[in-house]
From Swiss-Prot:
It comes from the Eukaryota. This is WD repeat and SOCS box-containing protein 2. The gene is Wsb2. Pfam families: SOCS_box, WD40. InterPro entries: G-protein_beta_WD-40_rep, SOCS_box, SOCS_box-like_dom_sf, WD40/YVTN_repeat-like_dom_sf, WD40_repeat_CS, WD40_repeat_dom_sf, WD40_rpt, WSB_SOCS-box_domain. May be a substrate-recognition component of a SCF-like ECS (Elongin-Cullin-SOCS-box protein) E3 ubiquitin ligase complex which mediates the ubiquitination and subsequent proteasomal degradation of target proteins.
Amino acid sequence: MEAGEEPLLLAELKPGRPHQFDWKSSCETWSVAFSPDGSWFAWSQGHCVVKLVPWPLEEQFIPKGFEAKSRSSKNDPKGRGSLKEKTLDCGQIVWGLAFSPWPSPPSRKLWARHHPQAPDVSCLILATGLNDGQIKIWEVQTGLLLLNLSGHQDVVRDLSFTPSGSLILVSASRDKTLRIWDLNKHGKQIQVLSGHLQWVYCCSISPDCSMLCSAAGEKSVFLWSMRSYTLIRKLEGHQSSVVSCDFSPDSALLVTASYDTSVIMWDPYTGERLRSLHHTQLEPTMDDSDVHMSSLRSVCFSPEGLYLATVADDRLLRIWALELKAPVAFAPMTNGLCCTFFPHGGIIATGTRDGHVQFWTAPRVLSSLKHLCRKALRSFLTTYQVLALPIPKKMKEFLTYRTF
């Protein structure tokens, strides 16, 4: 998909449920996720089941005319041709999913020391957050259950691993807390973060591993230090529950989505509100019942950091360019709940209330040299450090995303 083109539906996965299940209840796909290397896709297909699907999809799921790499390719460095679809029976409704990054060498040594009988942690791990407050940790390659983490008193709504490969996991729950777990130490709970007054809907760790964002039902967004596990600041601006959040790939931006029909883009270092993206009806309506039909469900950044994808209750998937205040593309979808980009770009996955997953084309653009330089610099410079540089004001504005 080129910039400016409408997203095309590439493929759709539908759950194959046993006949004893009621197809109209507990069938929602609350979460979808790609593994960091793009070799696996996971989706909660309802009725306590998570599907692990090797990527790219088998040919029967791909429409004619779409070019996809085969897992049997000679250029496949990780032997993906041998990967098989897995079905994980979690025993409870699954709300949150998160893949670990490939573990760092120190984490592998710690895991081997504390888990001598467990599979090699050089393989991927999937965490699942359940309806009863439990978190189950699975080894992706084999589908084996590795750990059961207990502590939350209500639904575990979201999960996030540190991108560094340290196997630190953060969970967000309806019990109004976030919890920090160290999988290197038998899943030991190392911290409980309190302060939210209502359900915590989501959590996201910045790519540089310095900050944790959490969002909840009391219209608030909290930013925490991942070093000291203390509250840095509260972000205020939404008028209703905040249900989704994501950091840009360089950690310089934070986006939050709310039932108030807006996405707010923040500077997480200063707390400044940079812009708002409003999800209005495409066609005017006289029916007051439709006033809140554009409530947001999910927001995510593209891998290169130039686009956002949002899913709303008005049956639309929207794609936004950072520099514009209106969507650059739309796609019709019914009952959307969540979305995520493929790690290497070009594809968006969305989950729905009926347990289906759809894959859409996403913009593929060659990032400008200016953006690549900004992204590289912001990966290790905070906003305050940029503002302290002896450079022209216009350059500072560009590097801090005040201009594009």
